[in-house]
Amino acid sequence: MLNKIMMTGRITTDLSVVTEDNHSYCKFSIAVDQPKRNDTETVETDTFTCLAFDDNARSVNFLYSKGGQITFVGSLRNAPDKKVVIILEELHFQNRFAVKVDVDSGQIF
């Protein structure tokens, strides 16, 4: 079975990395506008909870901030509270220029 989702949205929460038991994570929410069918329709926005782990968590925290636009590939999971969470698996950069980041040092090349 295939469980992949690609999302583009704006980060709606402040970002921080939490480390527990030698694993890091960053929990954040994104707002995604639904496409309008015509010019008179109002824009509807959905909010999704996302989780990034380890290197992805550090990259999200270093490269993005609240209000920033993010694009990523992930998978859907049920959280213990029965809500759906998107697990971030791959970051995708939208800029014209490629960015390479050393996650350990935070250096951008």
Predicted regions and their residues:
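Single-stranded nucleic acid-binding surfaces, predominantly the OB-fold ssDNA-binding core
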Residues: M1-F109
